[in-house]
Amino acid sequence: NEKGINNLKFIIMGDGPLKEEFENYAEEKKVDCQFTGRLEYEKMVGLLCSCDIAVNPIKKGSAGSIINKVGDYAAAGIPVVNTQENLEYKNILEKYNAGINVKNESFIDTANAIETLYNDKRIRIKYGENNRKLAEEKFDRKKTYNQIVKTIEGN
């Protein structure tokens, strides 16, 4: 690219109405991308764990709550570049210092956040470790289910 970064590989997991458009764009711009389509959960997790950075590209206005894939990112122990507008997730990502929140639909902010994590291995590793801690504290079903039961029982 124009900044001299040429050893990035993007792995796009999942499917959607713009998949073909993204594939064409990546080919036209000569971006190293692997488009997997939908994967079985186990395959997705294995591939996710091999990644250095996760990008959570949620369409503006889409997700009103914390979605399952952010738990997968956290469990994988990788930092997140987050475009999701959900305040709960933005705040928890910030509190745990587990990634970078960017303005939804700001491609420049997203690219800059990826570049920051790419260029600074120390931050990338620290944010990944923090995200794993987030998974253990907030997304571990054994812990969270017990908290739900206690709340229901009024304890």
Where are these regions (language model features)?
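Acidic donor-binding loop of glycosyltransferase active sites
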Residues: L47-G64, I78-V81
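Nucleotide-activated donor-binding/catalytic signature segment of Leloir-type glycosyltransferases, i.e.
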Residues: N7, I11, E20-G46, I53
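Flexible glycine-rich beta->alpha loop in the catalytic core of nucleotide-sugar glycosyltransferases
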Residues: K60-G61, N68-G71, P79, Q84-E88, ...
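A short, well-ordered alpha-helix in the C-terminal region of glycosyltransferases
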Residues: D109-N112, T116, I123-K138, Q147-K150
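Short alpha-helical segment that forms part of, or immediately flanks, the ligand-binding pocket
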Residues: E42-G46, I67-A76, Y89-N91
